[in-house]
Regions:
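Blade/loop signatures of beta-propeller domains
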Residues: 13-36, 176-179
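Short, conserved, GDST-rich strand-edge loop motifs in beta-rich repeat architectures
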Residues: 16-17, 69-77, 167-178, 217-236, ...
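Blade-loop segments of beta-propeller domains
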Residues: 45-54, 71-116
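Blade-terminus and WD-like Trp-Asp/Gly-His loop motifs, strongest in beta-propeller folds
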Residues: 53-64, 68, 102-117, 155-164, ...
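Asp-box/WD-like beta-propeller blade repeats and closely related beta-sheet repeat scaffolds
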Residues: 96-174, 179, 192-201
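Conserved blade-ending motifs and adjacent loop-strand segments that build the rim/top face
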Residues: 256-259, 295-305, 338-366
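Loop/turn-rich, solvent-exposed surfaces of beta-rich toroidal or solenoidal domains
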Residues: 275-281, 295-340
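Blade-level signature of beta-propeller repeat domains, shared across WD40, Kelch, NHL, RCC1
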Residues: 361-401
Length: 401
């Protein structure tokens, strides 16, 4: 933890969530955990963390990237925009509408994204120069020639040298068939290297953090008939796939529960974790050995993230019935002591079940700044979302005898 503090202090003059005027202190009434809520716009506007595969905060602690809407879905809202909080200047700036979940380079403080509408192409924005797009390349012709591109990537990930982006695109062919295409896009010239296509709903693609020739993808909606037919034939629920160049795809079965969702790479790329199913836990797969273990004792986990040193896990849980906008709580789990604490013990339903949210308001907790903080979304009964940043040191102390 001392090393993390030194990294955070490397950029002189940067405020922290504890000291910045952009945050207000929040204390959970049951667990006593202290978090810091981002303050921007009106109190009932939406401030939402990024999807858990993408880290919301840069390693130097200066920039926090988040989604924002003026208003909320109960009272009416404006368009969703990507924003950045600059903790050096204690200011918030608009990054526009990237058209997808961006890749955040947490070491060099910039984002990369691809957009299909309104100036299609792939772009970069430096977070210290917000709002100025730098075009990298056009949408690859190798995709547009196949048909109508529905989306370019579920959430963008880049190669280690940041020169290429992994795409898991969806393309509607002229005959109406949907093809799911995986491969690498060279950002300097728009050349696309296809790794192959699937007829099953293949998405959630994530390039391995330390290997440019390996991606983790999901068979989305594997509970529907095609996935169930595959399970009847092979015995395995076909959620998690390792994808490599040349069309090589390897199913990684969830051997303990034969069900999986929301998989994510470890930061060191040596393995990945996932959630079992409602009422289940967080599991982990080691690439080298194939060993699978339960890494978190929180039942009902739906999204999880592992700390850079693999000692801690955060996850969110819907304590009652799940829907888009249901009640949530978020947990921290100490793998060394096998103890947990609630970052927030329960948040009320954001939206009623008969009128669900369209903003994907799940908490999506994830570690940032080399494990110093956890970032997640917290819902409120009046229909607005808050963004919480929670110091990890207190969570370790609370779960250590």
């Amino acid at each position: 933890m001392i090393a993390n503090l030194m990294l955070a202090a490397a950029l002189t003059g940067v405020h922290t969530p504890e000291t910045s005027k952009l945050f207000e202190r929040r204390t959970d009434p049951e667990s006593g955990v202290v978090s810091y809520s981002l303050v921007y716009g009106a109190p009932d506007d939406n401030r939402q963390s990024l999807y858990f595969v993408t880290k919301s905060m840069t390693e130097d602690g200066r920039f926090l990237v988040f989604n924002y809407t003026k208003g909320n879905e109960r009272k009416g809202r404006g368009p969703r925009k990507l924003m950045v909080a600059d903790l050096l200047k204690d200011e918030v700036h608009e990054l526009g509408d990237p058209g997808m979940i961006p890749f955040v380079d947490c070491k060099k403080d910039y984002i990369v994204y691809g957009r299909l509408k309104q100036k299609p192409g792939f772009y970069r924005q430096n977070l210290d120069d917000p709002g100025r797009e730098i075009k990298l390349c056009d949408i690859p012709g190798a995709l547009t020639e196949m048909g109508r591109v529905r989306y370019l990537a579920t959430h963008l990930t880049l190669t280690r040298d940041r020169s290429k982006a992994f795409l898991d695109a969806s393309v509607i062919a002229p005959n109406g068939a949907t093809n799911y295409v995986q491969g690498l896009l060279t950002l300097a010239n728009g050349v696309f290297e296809s790794w192959g296509t699937t007829d099953f709903f293949c998405n959630h693609g994530q390039l391995n953090p330390v290997r440019d020739d390996l991606a983790l993808c999901a068979w989305e909606e594997a509970w529907l008939k095609p996935g169930q037919d595959y399970k009847k034939t092979t015995g395995w629920y076909p959620r998690m796939w390792l994808v490599e160049p040349g069309g090589k795809r390897t199913l990684v079965p969830a051997r303990d529960r034969n069900c999986a969702s929301h998989e994510v790479w470890d930061d060191d790329g040596r393995g990945f974790s996932w959630c079992g199913r409602p009422g289940d836990y967080v599991y982990h797969h080691d690439l080298a050995t194939g060993r699978q273990e339960r890494w978190c004792g929180i039942a009902g986990a739906r999204h999880n993230n592992v700390s850079p040193d693999n000692r801690y896990v955060v996850c969110d849980e819907a304590p009652e019935r799940w829907w888009r906008g249901c009640k949530w709580r978020v947990a921290f789990w100490n793998r060394e002591t096998e103890r947990g604490v609630w970052i927030y013990s329960t948040r009320p339903a954001l939206m009623p079940r008969e009128k669900q949210s369209r903003l994907h308001p799940d908490p999506h907790p994830h570690f940032v700044m080399n494990g110093r903080y956890v970032v997640c979304t917290a819902n409120n009964a009046d229909g607005h979302m808050d963004l919480y940043v929670t110091p990890v040191d207190q969570l370790v102390k609370m779960t250590t005898p």
